């Protein structure tokens, strides 16, 4: 049986997936696999693959969330024999806000890589 927090997290993932699809992205939730987790969602936009780690928590621990996203993107790439690890993002639910107002977290190095 899933606890209340687990249900909230699952609902957030479903809501984000539906919103991304509405915006024209290909988005699929990924199956949980313990230490080999590959992220919460894979998203394909304009042929580019991205891994999302979604968080619906009151306490934000960004370094922990970021490490988790990086490890899981690597797991995703390894499981599929990809030569390149997809960019990953942390998507954090904002309290009392709609899905399109969720925060998207990345580091500066990744941001500049995308812009070049």
Model-flagged regions — what are they?
Residues 1-116:
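Catalytic phosphate/metal-binding cores of nucleic-acid and nucleotide-processing enzymes, i.e., regions
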């Amino acid at each position: 049986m899933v606890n209340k927090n687990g249900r909230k997290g699952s609902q957030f993932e479903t809501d984000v997936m539906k919103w991304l699809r509405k915006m024209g992205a290909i988005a699929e939730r990924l199956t949980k696999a313990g230490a080999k987790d590959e992220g919460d969602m894979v998203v394909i936009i304009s042929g580019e693959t991205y891994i999302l780690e979604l968080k619906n928590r009151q306490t934000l621990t960004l370094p922990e969330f970021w490490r988790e996203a990086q490890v899981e993107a690597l797991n995703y790439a390894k499981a599929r024999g990809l030569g390149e690890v997809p960019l990953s993002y942390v998507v954090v639910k904002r309290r009392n806000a709609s899905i399109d107002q969720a925060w998207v977290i990345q580091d500066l190095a990744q941001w500049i890589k995308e812009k070049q």
